[in-house]
Amino acid sequence: MEKQIYLRKSIRRYRGNDIGEAALSVLASWRGWADVYAQGADADCDIQLLGSDAKLGGMYFIKAPRYIAYWGRPTREGRINAGFILEQISLKLTELGVGTCYLGATHISGANPDERGLEPIIIMSCGNPAEPLTRTSTSEFKRKRLDKICDAELNEKMRVILESARLAPSAMNRQPWQFAIEGGRIICCVEYSGLDAFRRLSEIDMGIVMSHILLTARAQCGAAHIEHSQQDALKAPRGTGYVATIVTENL
C-alpha cells in the first residue's frame, strides 16, 4: 500500500462496469488487514458498500458504480478513525486498479443513527477508472512544500516519512496539518477552522495523513505505533491543536 501514496489521485470518472471480485474481497475483509486509529467506543464502526442506485444527496456528487459509506461515532476520534481506515482502503483499491474519491459534501439521504449510535461519517466513490488511475510523478501533486508543514531538521528516513504526509489528500486541498519532531517522535497537529464543517473535515484529513505516516514509518523503520502524550501536546506548533504522536523505532 505504501507505494500507492506516491501515485494515487482522486478519480471522478468511472466506467459503468462493477469492481472485480478481488476488490470486493478487500472490502469485505478490511477488519482483517487495516489498522485502526481509535480505541474503545470511538473505534466502533462499519463499512457499508452501496451500489450505483444509492440515494445520496449533497452539494458535490460523482456518479460511480459503487460507494463506500463509513459509519462511525460522530466524535473527533471517530472522524479521525474514518480517515485513517478509508485511506488504507483507498490505497489498497488503487493497487488493484480501482479508483476512489472522497465525497466530503455528500451524504446518504434520510440516514439516521443505527442502534449503536453510529452515523454515516463520510462517503467514498469507487470504480474502474475512465481516466488515468495514477500520477506519473510526485510533481503532479499540488501540495505545500515540506518546510511549510514541518520546520524541523530532518534526517533522510524522517524526510521520506514526512514526504508521504505532504502528499496526503485533504478536503478542498486545505492540508490542515503541522508536525513537530522530537527524536523519533512525530507530533501530529491540526490547524483548526472556526467553521464546524471544516473542523469535522479536518479531523478526517488528520486520519488520512496519519495513515500515510504510519505506513511509511513502518516501511522505513520496521516498526511504528501511535501514542497520545500530554507532554507532546505542549510542543504543538503555534495555532494548532495536538492530535497524536507517531513513534518510530530504529530511526
Predicted regions and their residues:
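Acidic, surface-exposed loops and disordered segments
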Residues: 1-251
